[in-house]
Amino acid sequence: MKIKKIDWDNLGFNAHETKSMFRANYTPESNWQVEGLIPYGDVSLSPASTVLNYGQGIFEGTKAYQTSRERVVCFRLEDNANRFVSSSERMCIPPLPKGLFEKAVLEVVKDNLEFLPNKKQGSLYVRPIAFGEGPMLGVKASDYFTFLIYVTPVGSYFKSGLKSLNTIVSDKYHRTATKSVGFAKAIGNYAGTLLPFKEITEQGYDEIIFLNSSNENIIDEARSANIFVLKDNILKTPSLQGSILPGITRDSVIKVASHFFNLEVYEGDVTIEELMNGDEVFFTGTAAVIAPAGSINYKNKTIEFHTKYNDSMTKQIREKIIDIQHENIEDPFGWIIPLK
């Protein structure tokens, strides 16, 4: 396969063809069998596969970085692996053997180092996925599964660089429900946000905030990010009560805010009133790390945040996490996994 030329100075957050991907296959007779590295390319599926018909699939997202110590590292891989197990169990996908997730990620990153951007250009995004590939006409779990990891070089999540987001709270849609699959990185959770996001972008907004389906006085999260509200040096974020994704960047923010900045961190219900009266509001996720809210609209009322980003706690927390990821400072948490 001839790989298309990459514009390294204008990567954006897009999928690019790379050299190889990792594959393992599951059957009831042999459990998980490692196929290993294979050329990057299309995957063949039965039209009756459970992933196509019933959405039996999960994914993860992490990054590899070229650091100031002139080495390549991954960030919090064990946490991604643990969440992959949790998502697998919820979606009736046999969990991978212990250690395979981390080993496979490091192997595919190492084989695609030519696609790792330099420190100024970006990072290598890593996307592990698992899905039911066996044919099943009835609504049942597949007997056959595929585990794949592909990688792609990425730049800034935002085309014009980091910016404050104009956001809107949805009272029309819910992202998921308590006791459902909101805590899992199930593919259907994200498909359900496509229409709401399309509608709000047509209105000129950048991001959507979903309310809790059981209590619309409290917030859940954005379409692919957790939410934090800072007020009077107290940092609040919705608790992990079933409908919230246990974001790895979310957990990183909690630990960094407490360890480096002595902020009091509260995990619990966050009301609409608290959201609209915060000093700072920001979103967290692997893709953007942290993105600040510039404004929030709820029921045709818009509030704007007047704290300049360069003067904000949001910026300080974001830069501290990035410093750890790029080994500009010591990692006090044991999050960095070097490529050997």
Predicted segments — roles?
Residues G99, V108-Q121:
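Charged, gly/pro-rich active-site loop segments
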Residues P117-F131:
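Extended, Lys/Arg-enriched charged tracts that mediate electrostatic binding to polyanionic substrates
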Residues M1-V108, I129, M136-K340:
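Helix-start/capping segments and mature chain N-termini
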